[in-house]
Amino acid sequence: MVMKKSNIILTVCIAVAMTFSLPSQAQRLIPKQRGIEVVGSVPLIKGEKLFGGDNFGVGISLTHYLKRENYTFVGVEYEQQNMAYRSYNVKLKDALLQVGYMHPVLSDRGKNVLLYGGISALGGYEQLNEDKKLLPDGATLLNRSRFVYGGAVHGSVEVFLTDRVLFLVKAQGRFLFGTDVHCFRPAVSAGLRFNF
């Protein structure tokens, strides 16, 4: 009797565990489904180490799924880079708003791993050297802080961890106009998206 009871309990526990561990694709990529995405990024700077110094970025965006697994997004990003000048660094900070569209390029049969490509329009403010014109060696910085605008191309690999949580690895190339520094700014990022 005791053995029979423990077998029933064990069977019920295994059934419950399997029910919650097996994916149910019915709740994935539904039109009008929304999500919130949080990412950390690293700008790719020529001649610099990938994770060098204070070069980093963070972003948060809202996603809205359309038909056929594609989605739109609205996001804000902050990115900081250090540009070497003699023996010290000049900080370049960007605060950007992005509006874009992502289209599925490739996926596995169960829609667990998806490869997306997309485009976005962006605009924001770029601050250079915390608005200080005079550098520590007495030189005057001719570049200035200003509003910037442009577009970006995106590529991402999105992996469903659960039906509502995705792990993301993204690459983007931003084209910024109105800037005095670099017009093309590539970056890589990783993060999570929570669909609801």
Question: Where do the language-model regions lie?
Answer:
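Cleavable N-terminal export/targeting peptides
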Residues: 1-33
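Outer-membrane beta-barrel "beta-signal"
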Residues: 35, 98, 184-196
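Extracytoplasmic loops and strand-loop junctions of Gram-negative outer membrane beta-barrel proteins
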Residues: 41-44, 82-84, 136-141, 172-175
